[in-house]
Amino acid sequence: EIQLRKRYDLIPNVLSIAKKYMEHEKSTFDQITKLRTEALSNSDAEDPSAVAKLFSDDAKLSGMMGKLMVSMEAYPELRAVESMKEAMATYQDVEDNISAARRFYNSAVNELKNAVDIFPSSMIASAININAMPFYEDPESDTIQSTVNAAEFFDKS
């Protein structure tokens, strides 16, 4: 949750720098701001459904930020701005930290799931109302990578 909050705190900085150069991307900025607000409002870390909603909102936000990064490629003057370079480097560092935290979280969730599902700890878990938490899936893992056939590139006939 700390790493996600760092990302959410960084997003306004990236958007404010980018807005100066990308006026016609206003709808993207508005969607990102709305998703950020929704994600920040989901703060009950003990409720599995709230955590699942947070992860869902985060996946949408991550996708929108990816879209923004792609559209930034069309603005070489924006990529040349030093503050944007720093913001993007910081954003990438935060994404790397989120990836590491995701692995740690999923490992802990797996251990909890095993404890909740396996007897005798399952009896204790149900008695004190402990439920398994949702896994934090990487939104990038859902994208299907197309297979590249290298022979097509070398076949000139």
Regions found by a protein language model. Give the residues of each.
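A helix-centric hydrophobic-segment signal that preferentially recognizes long
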Residues: 1-157
